[in-house]
């Protein structure tokens, strides 16, 4: 089976399951965790592809001792996932003026994008993937090789995904415009929380898959949120 189809399949699985993982991680905050409208997070899709490729390297036995070979594998997974997280976060921060997540309050963080704690989580996730998930991934790929008709649904997923990215990019453009005009960095999760609270207070319908949908323009929500932040900063002085 071609590697491109394997990676496309893994990206599909990782993006969808990553979205579910993030949704559960947010505890009591019932809000779409993704950048896109649909139930998928691309960063986890890239992550699963990376974990699969690294796990496949274990057969090369680069280190003679099997225990240290696995330790090195888990460290490599942590480094790779942290690097993916840093590149994605930095690109959004520098070019889009949007902060998708913020680790500024965590020890040892770098630009609020990565930190030792989450790198440790990535290592733990890599180990969990290796022992609990990788065997099932291999079985799923074996099934896919015998049921290539399923690749139609993978193609359909990517068609919907691309349309979704184009649609979601329109919101990012508005956020970037506001950020550049006001010389601020927009915190993606904060503005989603703000709109959610606004809709609840106004007894308006909350759209889970469209967290930016509201009766008020997005620009008004951004202005109101940052005015509140400025007042909070002034009150602390």
Residue ranges and their predicted role:
Residues 1-237:
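Aromatic-rich, lipid-facing transmembrane alpha helices and their immediate juxtamembrane interface loops
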């Amino acid at each position: 089976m071609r590697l491109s189809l394997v990676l496309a399949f893994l990206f599909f699985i990782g993006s969808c399951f990553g979205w579910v993982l993030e949704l559960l991680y947010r505890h009591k905050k019932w809000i779409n965790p993704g950048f896109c409208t649909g139930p998928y997070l691309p960063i986890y899709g890239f992550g699963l592809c990376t974990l699969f490729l690294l796990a496949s390297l274990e057969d090369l036995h680069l280190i003679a001792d099997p225990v240290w070979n696995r330790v090195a594998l888990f460290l490599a997974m942590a480094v790779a996932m942290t690097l993916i997280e840093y590149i994605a976060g930095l690109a959004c921060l520098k070019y889009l003026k949007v902060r998708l997540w913020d680790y500024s309050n965590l020890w040892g963080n770098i630009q609020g994008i990565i930190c030792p704690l989450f790198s440790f989580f990535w290592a733990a996730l890599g180990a969990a993937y290796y022992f609990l998930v990788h065997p099932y991934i291999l079985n799923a790929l074996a099934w896919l090789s015998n049921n290539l008709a399923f690749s139609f649904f993978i193609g359909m997923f990517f068609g919907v995904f691309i349309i979704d990215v184009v649609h979601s990019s329109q919101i990012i453009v508005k956020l970037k415009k506001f950020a550049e005009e006001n010389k601020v960095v927009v915190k993606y999760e904060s503005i989603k929380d703000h709109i959610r609270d606004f809709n609840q207070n106004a007894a308006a319908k909350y759209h889970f898959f469209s967290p930016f949908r509201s009766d008020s323009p997005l620009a008004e929500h951004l202005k109101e949120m940052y005015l509140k932040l400025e007042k909070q900063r002034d009150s602390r002085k």
